[in-house]
Structures are given as structure tokens and as C-alpha cells.
Design a protein with these regions (language model features):
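C-terminal structural cap/anchor segments
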Residues: 60-134
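Residues on the lipid-exposed face of transmembrane beta-strands in outer-membrane beta-barrel proteins
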Residues: 24-28, 37, 64-68, 78, ...
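Repeated loop/turn-to-beta-strand initiation elements of outer-membrane beta-barrel proteins
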Residues: 32-36, 73-76, 119-124, 150-155
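Signature for the C-terminal beta-barrel architecture of outer-membrane proteins
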Residues: 1-74, 80-84, 89
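Outer-membrane beta-barrel "beta-signal"
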Residues: 172-186
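Transmembrane beta-strands of outer-membrane beta-barrel pores
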Residues: 30-32, 41-45, 80-86, 115-119, ...
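Outer-membrane beta-barrel translocator domains and adjoining extracellular loop/strand segments
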Residues: 1-2, 47-54, 88-95, 126-128, ...
Length: 186
């Protein structure tokens, strides 16, 4: 997005700068579970020096994950995600002071706990996101029941908090909610 005036914006022009993406992923058994790794490089071709604040700087990103069945029908999953911004000093120098600044190193970790009960028809799950860099979080507890092979229902909640008014989950701090769903699949 390109604003016509950073202090008194009346018009925004949407702009999609050229971007090249390179990446790789690996997954396999290790540590009595499944380990996965993904990495990617976002090459910001139109502003490799990082001086144009309207074009995101190049970034290197990676994700490492681990999943293990701790006992019958109970699994744990962990993930750690990282974004590293290149040319951060140029980004800070050229970003207008009125705008919040991204971090040079953004981190996000997740935890998923899943318990299956009653011949795997009832699923209790808890999914948590936490950003050590932004200090914000999202918690998602859920109960799901399969009435048949075609009909299931779930109830859960989304709890947001921490961080700043502009961080990924902090901006949703007042948007906690409870949801219910019934689904028929054919």
C-alpha cells in the first residue's frame, strides 16, 4: 500500500512489488516422533537495499516442528517459527515515525495438545500461539464430537491478548469469542 500522505492519508494505492521466493522442506521420524523443517527466503527484488518503506524488506523465514504421541490417543505438537528482516537499519531509518516498526526478528511458537476419547469420537484439543518477540498470544480450546461418519459438532473459544494495538494477536485483544458449529459431510 502506498499512502498519498503519511500524516493525512486520503488515498491509498495498492501496489504488489516483485518478489522471488526460494524454499525447501524436510520431514521425517526422529526423537520418537515426527520432526519437520521448512525454510524460505523472500527476495524483495524492487528494493533489495531496504530503503523504500512501502516495499517489504527481504526476509529469511524458517519453521521447525515436532509431533509425538505421548500415550494412546494423546498427541503433542510443537512449532517454532522465525522471520528475520534483512537490511533492518535501512528499514528503521526510512520507516515514517508515525508508523509502528516491525521487529528485526519475529518469533512465534505453538503448542497443540489433542486427546481422543470414546473410540475416537470425542476430541479435546488445545491450540496455543505465543509470540516471544511481540509478547502476544492466541488460545484456542475446542471440544468436537463425531455423531456419525457424516455429522459432527464442535464448541470452542478464541482468546486473544498481550502485545500492542498493532501486533498480530494484540490487535484482536477485545475480540475473544466462543463458537459452535455443526457439520454434515457427504
Amino acid at each position: 500500500m502506498i499512502p498519498d500522505n503519511i500524516n493525512n492519508t486520503t488515498k491509498i494505492t495498492y501496489h504488489y512489488p516483485k518478489l522471488s521466493v526460494y524454499g525447501a522442506s524436510l520431514q521425517g521420524r526422529a526423537l520418537d516422533g515426527v520432526v519437520s523443517f521448512e525454510a524460505g527466503h523472500y527476495d524483495s527484488r524492487q528494493d533489495r537495499s531496504g530503503t523504500d518503506y512501502t516495499i517489504p524488506n527481504s526476509q529469511t523465514k524458517f519453521l521447525i516442528g515436532y509431533q509425538k504421541q505421548l500415550r494412546e490417543d494423546f498427541t503433542i505438537g510443537l512449532q517454532y517459527y522465525n522471520e528475520y528482516m534483512h537490511d533492518y537499519s535501512e528499514y528503521k531509518k526510512n520507516q515514517p515515525s508515525e508508523l509502528p516498526k516491525d521487529k528485526k526478528l519475529y518469533q512465534l511458537s505453538t503448542l497443540r495438545l489433542t486427546q481422543l476419547l470414546f473410540h475416537q469420537t470425542l476430541r479435546l484439543s488445545f491450540f496455543a500461539f505465543y509470540s516471544p518477540s511481540d509478547r502476544d498470544y492466541l488460545l484456542n480450546p475446542e471440544i468436537k464430537y463425531n455423531f456419525s461418519d457424516h455429522v459432527w459438532a464442535a464448541i470452542g473459544g478464541l482468546i486473544f491478548g498481550g502485545g500492542e494495538k498493532w501486533s498480530q494477536f494484540g490487535q484482536l485483544d477485545k475480540n475473544d469469542n466462543v463458537y459452535a458449529q455443526i457439520r454434515y459431510e457427504f
